Curated annotation (Swiss-Prot):
Protein name per the record: FAD synthase
Pathway: Cofactor biosynthesis; FAD biosynthesis; FAD from FMN: step 1/1
PANTHER family in alphabetical order: FAD SYNTHASE
Gene Ontology MF terms: ATP binding; FMN adenylyltransferase activity
Pfam families tied to this protein: CTP_transf_like (PF01467)
Domain of life assignment: Archaea
Positions that bind ATP: T9, F10, H14, P15, G16, H17, D92, Y119
GO biological process: FAD biosynthetic process; FMN metabolic process
Cross-referenced InterPro entries: Archaeal_FAD_synthase (IPR050385), Cyt_trans-like (IPR004821), FAD_synth_RibL (IPR024902), Rossmann-like_a/b/a_fold (IPR014729)
Catalytic activity reported: FMN + ATP + H(+) = FAD + diphosphate
Cofactor(s), names only, from the UniProt record: a divalent metal cation
Organism: Halorhabdus utahensis (strain DSM 12940 / JCM 11049 / AX-2)
Listed EC numbers: 2.7.7.2
Record family assignment: Belongs to the archaeal FAD synthase family.
Amino acid sequence: MTTVVAQGTFDLLHPGHLHYLREAAGMGDQLHVILARRENVTHKDPPILPNEQRREMVAALDPVDEAIVGHDDDIFIPVERIDPDLLVLGYDQHHDRGDIADALAERGIDCVVRRASEYEPGYEGAVLSTGRIVERILETRD
């Protein structure tokens, strides 16, 4: 059995998130998703929704076998517990694939790191980022 981990913020779910999770699930037999804690998101605006609400939404998706909120201090502790065969990064996540692979190896986690492909919707006007969704809401609501 191939165990896969995907990770991210998953704030205001959109089709890009679904694409990422479906693709990651298709690379193995079991998909575990680790959601970044609001307080640990420092590379962009913090999530709008609370940790547990985001986890609940992701856990409800068909491709997902388990969804957990990440550790308070150490992002690799949940990965150690899951002990995946594969960790799949989102196509636009800021993490460097090589740096993640090195950090996993330093902890003795034998895990391949891949990057998911970009989602290409088959329709016009798709809004594929939380930031753009928020902008659209602000533009259309007074």
